Structure formats: C-alpha cells, structure tokens
Amino acid sequence: ADLNLVKDDAGATVVPGNNLTYTLAVANAGPSDAAALSVTDTIPAGLGFVSATGAGWACGQAAGVVTCTRPTLAVGAAPAITLVVSVPANYAGANPILNSATVGSSTADPTPGDNTDGESTPVGAGSADLAIVKDDGGASVVPGNNVTYALDVTNLGPSDASTVSVTDAVPAGLGFVSATGAGWTCGEAAGVVTCTRATLAVGPAPSISVVFSVPASYTG
C-alpha cells in the first residue's frame, strides 16, 4: 500500500493569540488496502493543542504528540484530518513555525519517502486592541477639593501589548496631585499625565487613579 501525506496550512500567516489550522490529507495509491494506519504530528515548541478531527479517524494528544488512527484505508483518499493548534498571545518562539506529519501502517509501503510532509508558517506581528474607560464615579466636585478619575485599560487581544502608554491632559485651571496604578509608572510634565507599562497581557490592567486639585478660586 503506497501511502502519502500532504500537510497544508492554506498559506496562512498566524498572529500570536490566534489558532493555526492544518489539513492533513492521506491517500493510498495501492495496490493493496492499508491496515492499522497511524498519523503522527509533534506540536511545535511553544504552541498548544486545541483539537484533531477527521471522519473515521480516532485522534488524541499525549506529551505534545498528536496521533490519529484508523483500522483500514482502501485504495484512494481518506477523509482529511483537521489539526488545530494555539499560538499564545505572548509567543516568542521560532518564526516561521515548522511542523511536519507522518503516516504509516502495518502494510508494507514500496515508496515511504512521501509519507512525511511539512509546512512553514510565518508568524505575523502581534495585534492588540486596546480600550480605555475614564470614570469620575459620578462625582460633583467643590472648588477647593480634589477630583479623582479611574482610568481602566483593557487589552482585547488577540496578542499581548508592549510599551503601553496612557496620557491624560490636566484640565485648564486644575493642578496635578497624583497618578498611581499597580504595574504602571506614572508622572506629569507640562500639564500632561503619562503612565506606562512594559507589557499588557490580554485582559484588564490594574486601574490607574489620577487625582487633580480644583482650586478654591476655580471659575473654569
């Protein structure tokens, strides 16, 4: 049974935080049926297993190796196997991602050289959708007191964000008091408050608290 395998990523470029899908196409060029087929695929370092499915295939994953089996394959093509792996939002591994799969059976194969096929998938630049909400808690401020704002930043993904910066101009007539937030480095210069952090994973960041003073003589 002359088996062959073709692995295809559909020309994808994967962005950290997303999944990468492979199609594994197995065929038997004969002349005999193949028995006890097994397709193996080692997940590349840094990636995670999501799923492996295919009609008539029994698939599973253990210790980073995906295995799909079927008892027999007549001459012709088998239903394709769809393998999905996850690329973490903070992926910093090999680029491109190299991955190969191999098919074998208990039936002698006269040309085993086409039983393995690989793909090289480029990793694109990360993409991070940042959002910010500014809230004064519904406060009414009295001249001579302070006004406090909460700045809530969220990374909607799919990738981690790097070199994150939040800026907030001090309103005319008000004074800067403080700006604090866990993991943030904050300061004020020339009437602009700036808070920075090196990275932000997908999800919310600790809130920033910005305090301005409203002078007793305020008439703005």
Predicted regions and their residues:
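Exported/extracytosolic protein signature
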Residues: 1-220
